[in-house]
Amino acid sequence: TDWISFHNRSSMSSAGVTMIAERCDDSYWEKNYDGYTLEVLKKLPPAKKRIIFINIDGSHYTYIARVPVNLRDKLGISKEDPYHDYDLTIAYDDQVMKDIFEYAKANLNLKSMIYFSDHGENMKHYHTTSPFYYDMVHIPFFVYLSPDYQAAHPELMPALKSHEQQVFTNDLAFDTVTGIWQAKTNFYQSQYDFSSKDYAINMDNATTFERKKKIKDDPVWQGK
């Protein structure tokens, strides 16, 4: 198991994540742009089986500082975009994810890839507990399963596709990831696993922010 992180290893906000990371076989703490992930992947020693966790820096403020200077004018983001700096980080990390995916498929015998954010962002208040805005919990989420992994676990892809339009929050990451990877524990609950036919989260019962906020109250879902 390998952990690759572009966050501060010793900050208070990263303490919990650091404790988990240090339990991996190897951990790599990088002070570089997210695109450097490829260089770290290329240095990993050969292994028959491997799980790699990658904790990229993403779209944290100050946004412009997250993107290499030589790429800032090459990512297709208009200078007239009112959220130029933030959107630049999105475009940059889209490219980073593409590069990681293509490298892993070509060189690491990629069986599955799961990506999600820990939070979204409000352009005025960033991400915080007070005040709370729903765009702070809008996150990207995607799952890739290789053809042979799908063949070995034929129940996964139909379940994932059937839930494509349903609610997912990263509170459900534990059950979903362990379900996809067939690493279920005594704590696993299939009703919270997005890849299970038993998935039971919907607009009526989905919550976020320590169950204090109902997803159905999000203005996006209400068409506002």
Outline where the language-model segments fall:
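Active-site-proximal alpha/beta segments of enzymes that process anionic O-linked groups
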Residues: 1-73, 169-170, 175-200
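Short, solvent-exposed loop/turn segments at the edges of secondary structure
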Residues: 21, 136-138
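A long, amphipathic alpha-helix that forms part
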Residues: 38-46, 71-116, 124, 143, ...
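Active-site neighborhoods of enzymes that stabilize oxyanions during catalysis
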Residues: 58, 131, 139
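Histidine-centered active-site/metal-ligand motif
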Residues: 60-61, 119, 125-130
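Flexible internal linker/loop segments at domain or repeat junctions
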Residues: 68-81, 149-158
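Membrane-interface soluble catalytic domains
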Residues: 102-107, 123, 130-132, 147-224
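SF2 helicase/translocase ATPase core recognition
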Residues: 139-145
